[in-house]
């Protein structure tokens, strides 16, 4: 088999969606001396199959996050999940956790031509919710979330819980002009 990157290296690869993750993995493999790389699409399908079999076991819940989403819904606020993760994996994870009804809608990888940090996914969610950018808030945990919000013209509130391609989110946010960063 292929060499396995250390966990810290994998953490630095995460943050741009699964396709970007695989691109970064391929670059790492090349740097590790791997001469023949596997087919991209078959690698993607294998990774998705492995993740599907794990049932989200490695995804950690941020304490209070789902209760917060529930409170927003009970207050009549439309809550959409916008993720660069694959739709099938996301829907399965939400169903298995019994939280699929928490969200009014989902915009996932493949739903738009350009994933975050492009604004397309957020614009699709806002439009689908029948809202305006001025009424929306993006709560995210990565630079891609923040940049997508900025590009879509909406407020970004960031939490320090996610992977941010190897750079602490608070540090990155300060240099990029994002001031609303909260501990997870």
Residue positions per predicted region:
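Active-site neighborhood of HAD-like aspartate-dependent phosphohydrolases
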Residues: 1-12, 165
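Conserved H-loop
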Residues: 3, 99-104, 132-133, 179
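Acidic, Mg2+-coordinating phosphoryl-transfer loop and its flanking beta/alpha structural elements
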Residues: 126, 137-183
């Amino acid at each position: 088999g292929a060499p396995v990157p250390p966990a810290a290296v994998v953490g630095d690869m995460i943050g741009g969606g699964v396709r970007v993750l695989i691109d970064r993995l391929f670059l790492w493999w090349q740097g590790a001396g791997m001469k023949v790389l596997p087919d991209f699409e078959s690698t993607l399908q294998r990774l998705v199959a492995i993740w599907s079999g794990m049932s989200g076991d490695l995804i950690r819940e941020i304490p209070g996050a789902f209760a917060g989403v529930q409170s927003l819904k009970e207050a009549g606020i439309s809550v959409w999940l916008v993720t660069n993760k694959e739709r099938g994996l996301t829907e399965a994870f939400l169903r298995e956790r019994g939280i699929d009804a928490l969200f009014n809608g989902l915009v996932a990888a493949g739903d738009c031509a350009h994933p975050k940090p492009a604004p397309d996914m957020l614009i699709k969610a806002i439009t689908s919710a029948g809202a305006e950018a001025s009424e929306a808030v993006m709560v995210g945990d990565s630079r891609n979330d923040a940049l997508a919000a900025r590009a879509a013209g909406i407020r970004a509130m960031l939490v320090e819980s996610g992977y941010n391609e190897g750079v602490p989110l608070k540090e990155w946010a300060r240099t990029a002009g994002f001031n609303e960063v909260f501990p997870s």
